Amino acid sequence: MVHHVSVPFFFHITDDGPARILRLTSPEGTNRLTRACVLALTAALAELRDELNKQPRPLIIAGNRHFFSVGADLNEIAALTGPEAYEFSAVGQTLMNAIASYLAPVIAAIEGHCMGGGLDLALACHRRIAAPHAVFGHRGAALGLMTGWGGTQRLPRLIGKGRALDLFIAAEKISAARALEIGLVDAIASDPVAGALRQLVAASS
């Protein structure tokens, strides 16, 4: 049974009451989803999935106060060849699908910036709780990029095609209040991790 897992420069996993908390911890603080990070996350989820038959536990994914995740490393993407970019897209999709198909509830506890592939990560979770200062966006279009990690499918299903196009094509950034209004997040809490834990306790009582 995993009580504490730490992958230097990427994330650590700890137990807290009814849930496991996976906290992104990149050294620069923006929680970029590099290829190495995505692969490490996928491996960690596979290990946790193997344990679910013994002790099913929900998972809370969080970042830090200022950044949930800014998504992929743009410098890394710029250096990719065509085949490498295709493979990186497939690697990211594998992670997002592992989260979406996880056998226990997965909640994104979002503070600060949740952008690009970071938003894809949040969209793959089953629920999203945001801090009042959270900011959401998919600014790839402004950079000549489009996500390959499933966000173009999950976001329209969640908030509708028109609103999703506003976020994708206009590279619009929205507040937590607006995200709640359009259904992108399920709740706002000053401490999203604590809010997620409260929801899980209430659901199990």
Residue ranges and their predicted role:
Residues 1-62, 97:
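Conserved CoA-thioester-binding segment of acyl-CoA-metabolizing enzymes
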Residues 2-27, 169-205:
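Amphipathic alpha-helical segments at domain termini/boundaries
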Residues 22, 61, 73, 121-123, ...:
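Hydrophobic/aromatic residues within transmembrane alpha-helices
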Residues 62-95, 114, 142-144:
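Glycine- (often His-adjacent) and acidic-residue-rich active-site loop
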Residues 95, 115-168, 196-198:
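CoA-thioester-processing core
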Residues 103-113:
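A short, small-residue-rich loop immediately preceding and capping a beta-strand
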Residues 106, 128-129, 188:
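Short, well-ordered beta-strand core segments
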